[in-house]
């Protein structure tokens, strides 16, 4: 049987790695990789690369510092969306609950298709502007 490369994690560019990592940590219930935890109060945070793992220690997302990050204008095409993340929830009620959680954590609503009978979903943008979808599966 042939071996294939395995996906380690998805890396998101950001001008604020800690802020974006914290957003996804809280949204998805992840934890920091050992050594990537926030510094003690009063200690500068100079992190330029952070990794989040699940409860089993499997890497899920990484955050890489960049100097600039033009925010996507999707659905307009001036600054295209080059990647987006899809997250599923179990019911329409959970879809609305998770949208509210995401917005409370700093996400912005981009598109509301929650009334779509075939595939209810929300498209939101994280604090760095990366689009992500919440939909019922």
Predicted stretch roles:
Residues 61-71:
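Short, solvent-exposed beta-alpha or beta-beta edge segments that form flexible loop/patches at the rim
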Residues 134-137:
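Short beta->alpha transition motifs characteristic of CBS
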Residues 2-4, 13-61, 104, 112-115:
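Core segments of cupin and vicinal oxygen chelate
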Residues 17-18, 56, 70, 78-128:
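Vicinal oxygen chelate
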Residues 8, 48, 119-121:
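Short loop/turn microsegments at loop-to-beta-strand junctions
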Residues 9, 60-62, 84:
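Structural preference for beta-strand elements that scaffold enzyme active sites
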Residues 1-4, 77-79:
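Short, flexible turn/loop "capping" segments at secondary-structure junctions
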